[in-house]
Amino acid sequence: APWVNYLGSPAYGAIISNNAGGYSFERSGANGRILRYVFNQFDQPGRYIYLRDDESGDFWSASWQPVAKDLNDYQVKCCHGMGYTRMEASYAGISSKAVYYVPQGKAYEVWALTVTNDSDRDRSLTLTGYAEFTNHSNYEQDQVNLQYTLFITRTYFKGNYIHQMQNEIYNPNSGRFLGLAGAKVDAYCGDRDSFVGTYRSYSNPKGIEEGLKGDLNYNTNSVGALESDIVLQPGETKELTYVLGGQKTEAEITEIISRYEKSGAVEAELAQLKNYWHSKLDNLQVNTPDKNFNNMVNTWNAYNCFITFIWSRAASFQYCGLRNGFGYRDTVQDIQGIIHLAPEMAKKQIVFMLSAQVTNGAGLPLVKYDHKAGQENHPDENDENSVYAKQTGHPSYRADDALWLFPTVYKYISESGDSAFLDEEILYANDGEKGTVYDQIGRAHV
């Protein structure tokens, strides 16, 4: 199985493997897909950056996949960090470093590429960033309903980015984009068939062998591919930044890309990310004779608990991301994993989940991302026209959902000392009634 890292926040999620495979989504792994990913043994497609030597025609990638050069000639190191992943590669006298991350508080991702000429002669290189967009933001629709999804997209080239639109007449802000800062776009492609070619794959795409031809998609499969031609003298380094995102206006896209024309922008954002995660994880550090145990407890187990807390297990390489909301039981359980590290975050999420408890004491099996306390439908409307069942696919409650409030609230108060929390009033999910935290827990066992 791929070695995976999780990047982002509740607003924007990205999953990336040690070979740059993976996918991205806005808010919902089910209904907010941006990058296409096929759940198979090949870990493809992903966030690909191709490098081509224009003199020899030889090409490779900034991660081992997708080109998969012979490892006797190609060296690569992948480092998964907290909120970022870094690939360092060396081949044919050229070294590269690609850093992938989602800036703190932003709803897009950055691929920061550094290329250095380690040889003793000038090198002419073509660098190409590649992203394969979903045709539909719903994962199942994109993979299955081809009679529809192959006829709703179109790509445009806007100077330094590819813009994909979906049903643009009815939804002019539905697009996704792949943009470039730090270099001129010398060629582009927005059509998958034109980029990959017939009977080819990501390892030998026609668009890399022959160069991009400016083909755009109109009702087939959309991609974003941006090509830049550079010349590096011996020892010279070039920095480029690709930016990927969705649901942005043209003005917003232009402003976002322009941020990365400024020197030091990437370094500042990475420092901010690292400081954020250290501020959380440093709240508990264990020290035993076993360094591997310390590293697991202090860093990776804690980091994974935070990601699970943020995404509520909604997306991974095992779980395809089909749940469009927070599972009640899972989310209340997951809060327990970060109480000792971030009690303020835990409290906020406990309040949110209490507001998804109905007046009969049960929890809504699926809590929508746009949940509105006091205004929600619920499974008690269990006739054939149940609005809640149609919206969520859950026609009934689960017996143990709300019971998980007992240990979670108890652990929060034990850790924080905030016993006054029991007296705070919170709206129930289904009408205007309020109850104290203590009262709501009391109803949970009924």
Task: Walk through the language-model features, giving the residues of each.
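Aromatic-rich carbohydrate-recognition surfaces in CAZymes
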Residues: 50, 326, 331, 335-445
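Anionic coordination/interaction segments
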Residues: 1-329, 343-352, 356, 382, ...
